[in-house]
């Protein structure tokens, strides 16, 4: 079957979404794209599993968002770093769940990252053969939709409609709650996916 998705897939599918918010809400599309391009540069092989492993091994801990900043400030261009604006670096650093970006463009990337992860995890679960669309509880699908396309359209449209004229990017309460609960549901599925990946690597080796 098709391989499970990686961080490049995450960018290719998530970035166009956050640019949709930017265009619809008259934000800075270039700033949004720059943050989206840089936000996961510091991610490890094997995604968050690799991040957790490095965090347990490094004396001062490891977080991919801090590593992304290190990449753009100190490692790129043979150690010279990139001449990025404060707004871009702020968006990269604060795209994490507990972060609070200072710009609406940064918030757009942060929201897109959450939405992309949910749909990627569902797609990976289906590809791995441990999940079907019909397995997703109706309390989530009734609000968000029954396919990746429907979920994306619902969440993107909801963000745009509820953020017009506001100094924030927000969701309606029903959509926000359904998305949050679906993330929790998919967390359990992701545990099974990680176990499957480990078994496949052992078979290859």
Model-derived segments and their meaning:
Residues 1-9, 15-30, 61-205:
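Histidine-centered, transition-metal-coordinating active-site segments
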Residues 32, 37, 51-53, 69:
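Alpha-helical ligand/cofactor-binding cores
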Residues 33-38, 42, 111:
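Short alpha-helix carrying the canonical HExxH Zn2+-binding catalytic motif
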Residues 42-46, 116:
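Short active-site segment of divalent metal-dependent hydrolases/proteases
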Residues 47-59:
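A glycine- and small-aliphatic-rich helix-loop capping segment at beta-alpha/alpha-beta transitions
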């Amino acid at each position: 079957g098709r391989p499970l998705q990686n961080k490049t897939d995450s960018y290719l599918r998530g970035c166009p979404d956050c640019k949709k918010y930017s265009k619809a809400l008259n934000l800075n599309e270039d700033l949004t794209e720059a943050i989206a391009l840089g936000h996961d540069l510091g991610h490890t092989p094997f995604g968050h599993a690799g991040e957790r492993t490095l965090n347990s091994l490094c004396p001062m801990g490891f977080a991919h968002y801090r590593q992304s900043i290190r990449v753009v400030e100190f490692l790129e261009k043979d150690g010279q770093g990139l001449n990025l604006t404060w707004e871009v670096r702020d968006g990269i650093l604060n795209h994490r769940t507990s972060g609070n970006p200072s710009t609406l463009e940064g918030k757009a990337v942060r929201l897109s990252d959450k939405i992309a992860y949910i749909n990627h995890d569902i797609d990976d679960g289906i590809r791995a053969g441990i999940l079907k669309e019909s397995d997703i509880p109706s309390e989530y699908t009734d609000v968000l939709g029954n396919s990746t396309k429907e979920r994306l359209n619902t969440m993107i449209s909801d963000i745009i409609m509820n953020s017009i004229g506001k100094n924030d990017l927000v969701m309606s309460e029903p959509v926000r709650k359904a998305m949050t609960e679906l993330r929790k549901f998919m967390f359990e599925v992701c545990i099974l996916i990680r176990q499957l990946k480990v078994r496949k690597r052992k078979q290859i080796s």
